[in-house]
Amino acid sequence: MSEREVKQIHEDQEAANAPAGLAQENAQVEETANENGSEDVSSAKKRDPEEDVTKADEPDKKKKKKRRTYDDDDDKEEKDGEEVKGKEAAKEKDSEGKEKVDADDDDEDEEDEEAEVVLGEDDEDDDDDDDEDDDEEYDESRADVGEEDDEEEDELNEIDQSNIISSGRRTRGKQIDFNEAAEKLDRENGLLEEDGEEEN
Protein backbone atom coordinates (compact mmCIF):
# COMPACT_ATOMS: atom_id res chain seq x y z
CA MET A 1 0.00 0.00 0.00
CA SER A 2 1.19 3.47 -0.79
CA GLU A 3 0.95 6.48 1.49
CA ARG A 4 -1.92 7.95 -0.50
CA GLU A 5 -3.98 4.80 -0.09
CA VAL A 6 -3.35 4.79 3.66
CA LYS A 7 -4.40 8.43 3.90
CA GLN A 8 -7.51 7.74 1.88
CA ILE A 9 -8.52 4.85 4.15
CA HIS A 10 -7.94 6.97 7.21
CA GLU A 11 -10.05 9.80 5.76
CA ASP A 12 -12.86 7.42 4.91
CA GLN A 13 -12.93 6.13 8.48
CA GLU A 14 -13.08 9.67 9.85
CA ALA A 15 -15.89 10.55 7.46
CA ALA A 16 -17.89 7.53 8.60
CA ASN A 17 -17.44 8.40 12.29
CA ALA A 18 -18.20 12.11 11.85
CA PRO A 19 -21.72 13.56 12.19
CA ALA A 20 -23.85 13.92 9.06
CA GLY A 21 -23.12 17.65 8.54
CA LEU A 22 -19.39 17.15 8.67
CA ALA A 23 -19.58 14.20 6.29
CA GLN A 24 -21.23 16.42 3.68
CA GLU A 25 -18.53 19.09 4.09
CA ASN A 26 -15.81 16.45 3.76
CA ALA A 27 -17.46 15.12 0.61
CA GLN A 28 -17.49 18.63 -0.88
CA VAL A 29 -13.84 19.10 0.02
CA GLU A 30 -12.96 15.77 -1.62
CA GLU A 31 -14.77 16.79 -4.80
CA THR A 32 -12.93 20.10 -4.98
CA ALA A 33 -9.66 18.30 -4.30
CA ASN A 34 -10.28 15.92 -7.17
CA GLU A 35 -11.18 18.79 -9.49
CA ASN A 36 -8.14 20.90 -8.52
CA GLY A 37 -5.84 17.92 -8.17
CA SER A 38 -4.08 19.42 -5.16
CA GLU A 39 -2.98 17.46 -2.14
CA ASP A 40 -3.05 20.49 0.16
CA VAL A 41 -6.84 20.34 0.28
CA SER A 42 -6.65 16.86 1.77
CA SER A 43 -4.87 18.31 4.77
CA ALA A 44 -7.74 20.78 5.10
CA LYS A 45 -10.16 17.84 5.20
CA LYS A 46 -8.45 16.42 8.25
CA ARG A 47 -9.10 19.54 10.25
CA ASP A 48 -12.12 19.52 12.45
CA PRO A 49 -14.09 22.79 12.29
CA GLU A 50 -14.71 22.57 16.03
CA GLU A 51 -10.95 22.59 16.60
CA ASP A 52 -10.64 25.74 14.52
CA VAL A 53 -13.18 27.50 16.75
CA THR A 54 -11.40 26.45 19.95
CA LYS A 55 -8.01 27.48 18.57
CA ALA A 56 -9.35 30.92 17.70
CA ASP A 57 -10.60 31.36 21.26
CA GLU A 58 -7.27 30.33 22.85
CA PRO A 59 -4.46 32.88 22.79
CA ASP A 60 -1.24 31.76 21.16
CA LYS A 61 1.42 30.96 23.73
CA LYS A 62 4.22 32.00 21.39
CA LYS A 63 2.65 35.34 20.63
CA LYS A 64 5.22 38.11 20.26
CA LYS A 65 5.20 40.79 22.87
CA LYS A 66 4.08 44.14 21.60
CA ARG A 67 6.74 46.81 21.85
CA ARG A 68 5.92 49.60 24.18
CA THR A 69 5.44 52.90 22.50
CA TYR A 70 5.66 56.02 24.57
CA ASP A 71 3.31 57.83 22.24
CA ASP A 72 0.47 55.92 23.90
CA ASP A 73 1.43 57.48 27.24
CA ASP A 74 1.36 60.95 25.71
CA ASP A 75 -2.11 60.31 24.32
CA LYS A 76 -3.33 59.21 27.76
CA GLU A 77 -1.94 62.37 29.35
CA GLU A 78 -3.68 64.52 26.75
CA LYS A 79 -6.97 62.72 27.38
CA ASP A 80 -6.57 63.18 31.14
CA GLY A 81 -5.90 66.89 30.60
CA GLU A 82 -9.00 67.23 28.45
CA GLU A 83 -11.10 65.44 31.08
CA VAL A 84 -9.83 67.79 33.79
CA LYS A 85 -10.65 70.82 31.65
CA GLY A 86 -14.11 69.39 30.96
CA LYS A 87 -14.74 68.87 34.67
CA GLU A 88 -13.66 72.43 35.47
CA ALA A 89 -15.99 73.82 32.82
CA ALA A 90 -18.83 71.68 34.17
CA LYS A 91 -18.22 72.96 37.71
CA GLU A 92 -18.38 76.56 36.51
CA LYS A 93 -21.66 75.93 34.74
CA ASP A 94 -23.23 74.02 37.66
CA SER A 95 -24.37 77.00 39.65
CA GLU A 96 -24.40 80.75 39.31
CA GLY A 97 -23.06 81.20 42.84
CA LYS A 98 -19.90 79.38 41.97
CA GLU A 99 -19.50 81.44 38.82
CA LYS A 100 -19.60 84.66 40.85
CA VAL A 101 -16.98 83.35 43.27
CA ASP A 102 -14.79 82.35 40.32
CA ALA A 103 -15.18 85.83 38.84
CA ASP A 104 -13.97 87.37 42.13
CA ASP A 105 -10.98 85.03 42.12
CA ASP A 106 -10.19 86.07 38.56
CA ASP A 107 -10.17 89.75 39.57
CA GLU A 108 -7.77 89.00 42.43
CA ASP A 109 -5.52 87.00 40.10
CA GLU A 110 -5.39 89.88 37.63
CA GLU A 111 -4.46 92.33 40.41
CA ASP A 112 -1.70 90.00 41.61
CA GLU A 113 -0.33 89.70 38.08
CA GLU A 114 -0.31 93.49 37.66
CA ALA A 115 1.54 93.89 40.96
CA GLU A 116 4.11 91.30 39.88
CA VAL A 117 4.62 93.10 36.59
CA VAL A 118 5.27 96.41 38.37
CA LEU A 119 7.66 94.77 40.83
CA GLY A 120 9.33 92.83 38.06
CA GLU A 121 10.24 95.98 36.12
CA ASP A 122 11.98 97.50 39.15
CA ASP A 123 13.82 94.26 39.83
CA GLU A 124 15.15 94.19 36.28
CA ASP A 125 16.88 97.56 36.75
CA ASP A 126 18.49 96.35 39.97
CA ASP A 127 19.61 93.17 38.24
CA ASP A 128 21.44 95.19 35.59
CA ASP A 129 23.42 97.04 38.28
CA ASP A 130 24.21 93.77 40.01
CA ASP A 131 25.45 92.28 36.75
CA GLU A 132 27.85 95.18 36.25
CA ASP A 133 29.17 94.82 39.81
CA ASP A 134 29.62 91.09 39.32
CA ASP A 135 31.53 91.65 36.07
CA GLU A 136 33.91 94.09 37.78
CA GLU A 137 34.54 91.71 40.68
CA TYR A 138 35.19 88.88 38.26
CA ASP A 139 37.66 90.93 36.23
CA GLU A 140 39.54 91.95 39.40
CA SER A 141 39.73 88.37 40.63
CA ARG A 142 40.98 87.18 37.23
CA ALA A 143 43.70 89.85 37.27
CA ASP A 144 44.94 88.63 40.68
CA VAL A 145 44.86 85.00 39.57
CA GLY A 146 46.68 85.82 36.33
CA GLU A 147 49.74 87.14 38.18
CA GLU A 148 50.00 83.98 40.28
CA ASP A 149 49.60 81.77 37.20
CA ASP A 150 52.59 83.38 35.47
CA GLU A 151 54.92 82.59 38.38
CA GLU A 152 53.76 78.98 38.55
CA GLU A 153 54.16 78.51 34.80
CA ASP A 154 57.80 79.68 34.91
CA GLU A 155 58.68 77.09 37.55
CA LEU A 156 57.01 74.37 35.57
CA ASN A 157 58.81 75.35 32.38
CA GLU A 158 62.19 75.08 34.11
CA ILE A 159 61.38 71.62 35.36
CA ASP A 160 60.06 70.47 32.00
CA GLN A 161 63.09 71.78 30.10
CA SER A 162 65.54 69.94 32.33
CA ASN A 163 63.97 66.57 31.50
CA ILE A 164 63.82 66.95 27.72
CA ILE A 165 65.85 64.39 25.80
CA SER A 166 66.99 65.87 22.51
CA SER A 167 68.01 62.60 20.85
CA GLY A 168 65.49 60.18 19.46
CA ARG A 169 66.71 57.24 21.59
CA ARG A 170 64.80 55.82 24.49
CA THR A 171 66.52 55.68 27.83
CA ARG A 172 64.12 53.33 29.62
CA GLY A 173 63.93 55.59 32.62
CA LYS A 174 67.65 56.24 32.94
CA GLN A 175 68.77 59.81 33.47
CA ILE A 176 71.44 60.67 30.93
CA ASP A 177 73.72 63.66 31.18
CA PHE A 178 74.41 64.46 27.55
CA ASN A 179 77.35 66.75 28.31
CA GLU A 180 79.23 63.93 30.04
CA ALA A 181 78.31 61.48 27.29
CA ALA A 182 79.55 63.94 24.64
CA GLU A 183 82.88 64.38 26.47
CA LYS A 184 83.35 60.60 26.63
CA LEU A 185 82.64 60.25 22.93
CA ASP A 186 85.04 63.08 22.09
CA ARG A 187 87.78 61.45 24.16
CA GLU A 188 87.20 58.11 22.46
CA ASN A 189 87.16 59.70 19.02
CA GLY A 190 90.11 61.88 19.94
CA LEU A 191 92.09 58.91 21.14
CA LEU A 192 91.26 57.01 18.00
CA GLU A 193 92.22 59.97 15.84
CA GLU A 194 95.46 60.45 17.74
CA ASP A 195 96.27 56.76 17.28
CA GLY A 196 95.49 57.07 13.55
CA GLU A 197 97.78 60.12 13.17
CA GLU A 198 100.70 58.37 14.84
CA GLU A 199 100.52 55.49 12.39
CA ASN A 200 100.85 57.82 9.39
From Swiss-Prot:
User: Record keywords: Nucleus included?
Assistant: yes
Residue ranges annotated as compositionally biased, kind Basic and acidic residues, are 1-13, 42-61, 78-101, 174-190
Q: Polar residues composition bias: which ranges?
A: 25-41, 159-168
Statement: the UniProt record of this protein carries the keyword Nucleus: yes
Subcellular location per the Swiss-Prot or TrEMBL entry: Nucleus
Q: Which intervals carry biased composition (Acidic residues)?
A: 102-139, 146-158, 191-200
Disordered: annotated span: 1-200
Please report any disulfide bonds recorded for this protein chain, giving both cysteine positions.
none
Q: Which UniProt keywords apply?
A: Chaperone, Nucleus
The entry's cellular-component GO terms read: nucleus
UniProt similarity note: Belongs to the CHZ1 family.
The role this protein plays is: Forms a chaperone-bound H2A.Z-H2B complex that acts as a source for SWR1 complex-dependent H2A to H2A.Z histone replacement in chromatin.
Q: What quaternary arrangement does the UniProt entry report?
A: Forms a heterotrimer with H2A.Z-H2B, stabilizing the association of the histone dimer. Also, with a lower affinity, forms a heterotrimer with H2A-H2B.
In its UniProt entry, what is this protein called?
Histone H2A.Z-specific chaperone CHZ1
Q: Which species does this protein come from?
A: Lodderomyces elongisporus (strain ATCC 11503 / CBS 2605 / JCM 1781 / NBRC 1676 / NRRL YB-4239) (Yeast)
Its lineage reads:
Eukaryota, Fungi, Dikarya, Ascomycota, Saccharomycotina
Gene for this protein? CHZ1
